[in-house]
Amino acid sequence: ELVELGLFEEFSLGRRKYLRSNDGHEVIWQKAKAYLRTPVKFEIWTHSPVFLRASEICLAGISALSKLTMVNADQETCYALSPAQWRENQTNITVLPEKEPGATCYQILAYESRLQRSKDANSSRTSCVDALSLWLSFRDNGDSRIELALSDLEKEFRW
């Protein structure tokens, strides 16, 4: 797919096949953006408890963005659930038809997100979804404060 999209070209050395690009990381990133999609399959709101091990708790959405940038968090917390975590918990969750005060948001992701530790020294035990997944989940948001935070987040991507 990477070759078909024009991001890389394939070449062979002996029996091995390799990919190469004459473009730098930034150019590849700019070209690839159009083909990337959000990892969030769907989002639910609930008052029901979701039982996860401490190592599995992962902030998502605006909660994660507020830990990694200067944007303010909402009062309600948002967490990420992998497909497996969702399957394990969904029978015990009463999903609300819409966001309610005091409810918790869960974003069900298409894949298991790599955890990223928050830079906030006061919450060193807080894990967030990886920066790329977070960026993708907000990229078409349209809110100017979110766009500014995404720009800051994008500058920190390590290639």
Give a label for each model feature:
Residues 30-159:
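Long, low-complexity, charge-rich intrinsically disordered regions
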Residues 4, 29-30:
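Internal, well-ordered alpha-helical scaffold/interface segments
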Residues 15-22:
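Minor-groove-contacting beta-hairpin "wing" of winged helix-turn-helix DNA-binding domains
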Residues 3-14:
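A short, conserved structural fragment
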Residues 1-4, 135:
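A broad, low-amplitude sensor of folded, mature protein cores
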Residues 23-28:
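Basic, amphipathic "hinge/linker" alpha-helix immediately C-terminal to the N-terminal HTH DNA-binding motif
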